[in-house]
Amino acid sequence: MTHFIKICGITNKEDAQMVEAEGADALGFILHEESSRFIEIDKVISITESIKNNLEIFLVFVNKGQEFVQECLDRIPQAIPQFHGD
């Protein structure tokens, strides 16, 4: 069986690079202001630019409108949206 490993809640370059070095397949970024792991989209861009391997990038949205989601995906076109909430 093949496993797909995604580490969510990344908030800094050091953690992202450690996850990359340990062989994870994907990074997840929480774009929900009420989360303790919340990160601004500009910081996500900076972190993803520091990654050398082609890790999958997930953007986690909680009850966000279509306009905000589209804006984020326009800025990080390779990202995969992940939705939570109502």
Give the residues covered by each predicted segment:
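Conserved N-terminal beta1-alpha1 strand-loop-helix module at the mouth
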Residues: 1-86
